Amino acid sequence: MKFAIVLIACFAASVLAQEHKPKKDDFRNEFDHLLIEQANHAIEKGEHQLLYLQHQLDELNENKSKELQEKIIRELDVVCAMIEGAQGALERELKRTDLNILERFNYEEAQTLSKILLKDLKETEQKVKDIQTQ
């Protein structure tokens, strides 16, 4: 259920981002627009990765393979590190004083969604580590 909510929120953010067209010579605004667009795209890819890992987790529960468990943990570590790095960039951008309300909302939304996704990935990683393998 929460995946559907997050997916709807990402879709809404992407629709809002597409409607907002920056001025032709406003490079800072264009950078903000592209950064949010990339962040939303990365969050969406992270959600798809989480769904894919859920299928791998189901397979791990059936097979109890040590190799598959290690592979899943490595993938989760990489995705979590990428999200944490993106959160740092979003935090730096939120400290800017020249953001308008829409830009601030977009940055805060991307930051909140990335925190939710990171929490879900950490929970999944703990589930994988708790599985006894052969």
Curated annotation (Swiss-Prot):
Keywords: Allergen, Coiled coil, Signal
Signal peptide range in chain numbering: 1-17
Transmembrane segments: none
Annotated coiled-coil segments of the chain: 18-113
GO molecular function: protein homodimerization activity
InterPro entries hit by this protein: Mite_allergen_group-5/21 (IPR020306), Mite_allergen_group-5/21_sf (IPR038455)
Family per similarity comment: Belongs to the mite group 5 allergen family.
Quaternary structure annotation from Swiss-Prot or TrEMBL: May exist as homodimer and homotrimer.
Protein name as annotated: Mite allergen Blo t 5
